[in-house]
């Protein structure tokens, strides 16, 4: 059986960069990692609570964290920052203050910036949120997958693969369904592939969504 490696870790240093940029003494590394995870979770929860109600998509593609001696710089890459900014004009300042209180970092200042992504549906995280929203609203999984593929076509991607696993449509036996459009060369290290795995809770149980997007070709 072929084993599937995580496509992002597989390409680190070639087409994929790190989402956390900092150095620490070996004994402090685990603390730094836990802090990063807490920052990411805190931001995601805040955005979830304060987004406009009508939107089921949080629109966070990724969160990058850069740490210096006196500063923690957090860059949130969002597909639809308007939804957050319109619902709370002072949202970013408020988030910054709450995060600073939460982490009580005495000698480190915390700074948050939001960057808009030009083609939000080219990001697997945003697409996975879209599919999750559809599945929660009891839209058929095939319809949700096809709609997601249509949305990526607007973002000029070269290929996409979507996989949903679990008790699909409430069936008794769990199964895996997938659909692919275009090329998705997982074995080519120079191929820029974006990937995410996402868990969605439906009334029938937990479903897992995996999305691979082939962005641009081998140089």
Swiss-Prot record:
Q: Which residues form the signal peptide?
A: none
Asked if Endoplasmic reticulum is a keyword of the record, the answer is no
Q: Give the InterPro entries listed for this entry.
A: KH_dom-like_a/b (IPR015946), KH_dom_type_2 (IPR004044), KH_sf_prok-type (IPR009019), Ribosomal_S3_C_sf (IPR036419), Ribosomal_uS3_bac-typ (IPR005704), Ribosomal_uS3_C (IPR001351), Ribosomal_uS3_CS (IPR018280)
Provide the alphabetized UniProt keywords: Chloroplast, Plastid, Ribonucleoprotein, Ribosomal protein, RNA-binding, rRNA-binding
Q: Which Pfam families match?
A: Ribosomal_S3_C (PF00189)
- Where is this protein primarily located? plastid
Q: Which GO CC terms are listed, alphabetically?
A: chloroplast; cytosolic small ribosomal subunit
Gene Ontology biological-process annotations: translation
Places the protein is found: Plastid, Chloroplast
Oligomer status and interactors: Part of the 30S ribosomal subunit.
Q: Which PANTHER family match?
A: 30S/40S RIBOSOMAL PROTEIN S3, SMALL RIBOSOMAL SUBUNIT PROTEIN US3C
- In which family does this protein belong, per the annotation? Belongs to the universal ribosomal protein uS3 family.
Question: NCBIfam families this protein is in?
Answer: rpsC_bact
Please state what the protein is called. Answer: Small ribosomal subunit protein uS3c
Source organism of the structure: Panax ginseng (Korean ginseng)
Taxonomic lineage is: Eukaryota, Viridiplantae, Streptophyta, Embryophyta, Tracheophyta
Gene (name only): rps3
